[in-house]
């Protein structure tokens, strides 16, 4: 997946990206999406690096992403409380027909990262190796697989 902030970065599709992440606040969102649509899935994202707003505000963000034409919606906040995990998972439940990634960053957001796909979210994020994380609180793929295996959410053949 490639992250696009301006239409000039759309060549990610030429590099073989199957999903391109475009921030909802991108000034040239529509032209960027027009370059991508039909060639890759458009993931329209929102990141809040300060905290986790009330669920009503998060719902409005998802509605804006849907209106923008997102194939996949992504809402990522920063957990300042363990309760923020529940808020992010509740967001998934409120949009059952939408491909949605909803999780919280930071150490306090770990539960939402792990549970997002188990709660109906489209997928989650993990780093390939330690110290290569793309966001605070991200765990490695191998750690995530071990957790999923322990709770019976992943086959043991890995």
Tell what function each PLM region has:
Residues 9, 32-33, 62, 113:
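Generic hydrophobic/aromatic pocket-lining and core-packing "Φ" positions
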Residues 14-19, 35-44, 66-72, 95-98, ...:
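Glycine-enriched alpha-helix->loop->beta-strand junction motifs that scaffold or abut catalytic
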Residues 56-72, 143-147:
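Ligand-binding grooves and catalytic loops that recognize ribose/phosphate and carbohydrate rings
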């Amino acid at each position: 997946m490639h992250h696009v902030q301006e239409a000039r970065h759309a060549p990610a599709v030429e590099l073989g990206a199957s999903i391109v992440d475009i921030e909802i606040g991108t000034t040239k969102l529509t032209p960027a999406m027009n370059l991508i649509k039909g060639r890759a899935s458009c993931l329209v994202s929102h990141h809040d690096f300060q905290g986790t707003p009330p669920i009503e505000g998060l719902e409005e963000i998802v509605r804006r992403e849907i209106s923008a034409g997102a194939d996949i919606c992504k809402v990522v906040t920063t957990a300042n409380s363990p309760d923020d995990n529940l808020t992010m998972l509740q967001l998934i439940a409120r949009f059952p027909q939408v491909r949605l990634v909803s999780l919280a960053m930071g150490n306090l957001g770990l539960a939402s990262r792990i549970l997002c796909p188990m709660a109906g979210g489209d997928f989650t994020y993990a780093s390939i190796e330690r110290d290569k994380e793309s966001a605070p609180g991200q765990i490695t793929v191998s750690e995530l697989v071990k957790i999923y295996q322990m709770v019976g959410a992943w086959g043991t053949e890995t």
